[in-house]
Curated annotation (Swiss-Prot):
Monomer. This is 3-phosphoshikimate 1-carboxyvinyltransferase. It comes from the Bacteria. The keyword Transmembrane does not apply. The gene is aroA.
Length: 441
């Protein structure tokens, strides 16, 4: 355990950059490893989750190296060229690595065992096992479809048409990646749109992929298999999920005026910023541009008094990871914020609904937990009291709980004690040092 008390340290000023987008980092390594030739990646997020993906692709034959300037070089094996790994693939804490790599392995004639840490081993994999089994892959999983899990891939696999029963970019991506080495056309039908990095990047690497909208509004995504992917040069934009912590911090701490540079604003990911604007947050987009098919801008954020709202459940897929820090913003808003439709948060790295209710209550917020969300009565802009001496927030090995409550701490009177800051390294290794530099006078 590495506990830490986060305390008010003055306004956030100046300009900061956040690390590369986690979703794009994972996919650039995976698709680079399936292309023929060298893919070069700058701005890669070097957190533990992405490094788990890189280690797994190395174990299956790709050559992946980082040079002294921080550029990553990926020499791929070609679609269909993945090799049998010699030992279990350790996914650490990364649900994304696990589910997407299961898709890749499922349609190669290899067998792989996936293992993970205590938190990942509690997360259900059944939603990925179901469609991949239909394609012909075989699974031996721990009870409840959990890790450790052994997957026996099949080639040639059977192309399927799969309608997602629950909005999940990871399940969608797993099936599309499985489709790359499957003869014919693999189809995913998505009733509610989720983040579309996989579609954008598959096209960018040269896969034949189409997206149509059905009569009922569902997205119909088709990928033609036995593709030949071409290597790419990728500049990874800053991660909006990481930027979220600093955007909320600057809104809450009086006197703040902060620019967060190079933030990816993919519309399937950036709903938090729209919700915060609806609450009265001053968030301005400067220097809007497009990098590698992804919209990017610098965000200028100024301290604002937020007002509570009813958050439309339709935005959930576009900000599913940002709710913990939105709860912190709501705790200091004027009036009541109501969130619904958040069942998915109960099966993240922790049960984020109950974990954040307990954490915010400990810090002095007024919170009611419901089946599918939280109802938060804000302080009207006053700082939270903070946690009492000897009391610390339980993060449940969840990086987003730890970082959200760190932000609550810098917007509190007495500070917030977080029981363990180590999980932060999974997605944002420089979070604490960046927070210190933003609040340094």
């Amino acid at each position: 355990m590495r506990p830490r008390r986060f305390t008010a340290n003055g306004p956030l000023k100046g300009r900061i950059g956040v690390p590369g987008d986690k979703s794009i980092s994972h996919r650039s390594i995976m698709l680079g490893a399936l292309a023929v030739g060298e893919t070069r990646v700058t701005g890669l997020l070097e957190g533990e989750d992405v490094l788990s993906t890189a280690a797994a692709m190395r174990a299956m034959g790709a050559t992946i190296e980082r040079d002294a300037d921080g550029m990553w070089h990926v020499h791929g094996v070609g679609v269909g060229g993945l090799l049998q790994p010699q030992q279990a693939l350790d996914m650490g804490n990364s649900g994304t690595s696990t589910r997407l790599l299961m898709g890749l392995v499922a349609t190669h004639p290899i067998t792989a065992t996936f293992v993970g840490d205590a938190s990942l081993s509690k997360r259900p994999m059944g939603r990925v096992i179901d469609p991949l089994s239909t394609m012909g892959a075989e699974f031996t999983a721990s009870p409840g479809g959990r890790l450790p899990l052994t997957l026996r891939g099949i080639s040639p696999a059977v192309p399927i048409e799969y309608r997602l029963p629950v909005a999940s970019a990871q399940v969608k991506s797993a099936v599309l990646l499985a489709g790359l080495n499957t003869p014919g056309v693999t189809t995913v039908i998505e009733p509610i749109p989720t983040r579309d990095h996989s579609e954008r990047m598959l096209r960018g690497f040269g896969a034949e992929l189409t997206v149509d909208v059905a009569a009922d509004g569902a997205r119909v995504i088709r990928v033609r298999g036995e593709a030949e992917l071409k290597p790419q040069d990728i500049a990874v934009p800053g991660d909006p999920s990481s930027a979220a912590f600093f955007v909320v911090a600057a809104l809450l701490v009086e006197g703040s005026d902060l620019v967060v540079e190079n933030v990816g604003l993919n519309p399937t990911r950036a709903a938090l910023f729209d919700v915060l604007r609806l609450m009265g947050g001053s968030i301005e987009e400067l220097n809007r541009r497009e990098v590698g098919g992804e919209p990017v801008a610098d965000l200028r954020v100024r301290h604002s008094l937020l007002t509570g709202i009813d958050v439309d459940p339709a935005v959930v897929p576009s900000m599913v990871d940002e709710f913990p820090v939105l709860f912190v913003a709501a705790a200091l808003a004027k009036g009541r914020t109501v969130t619904t439709g958040l069942e998915e948060l109960r099966v993240k790295e922790s049960d984020r609904i109950s974990a954040m209710r307990a954490a915010l209550e400990l810090a002095g917020a007024t919170v009611t937990e419901t089946e599918d969300g939280l109802i938060i009565d804000g302080t009207g802009g006053d700082p939270l009291p903070g946690t009492a001496e000897g009391a610390s927030v339980v993060t449940h090995l969840d990086h987003r709980i730890a970082m959200s409550m760190a932000i609550a701490g810098i917007a509190s009177r007495n500070g917030v004690e977080v029981d363990d800051t180590r999980p932060i390294a999974t997605s944002f290794p420089v979070f604490e040092s960046l927070l210190e530099s933003a609040t340094r006078p």
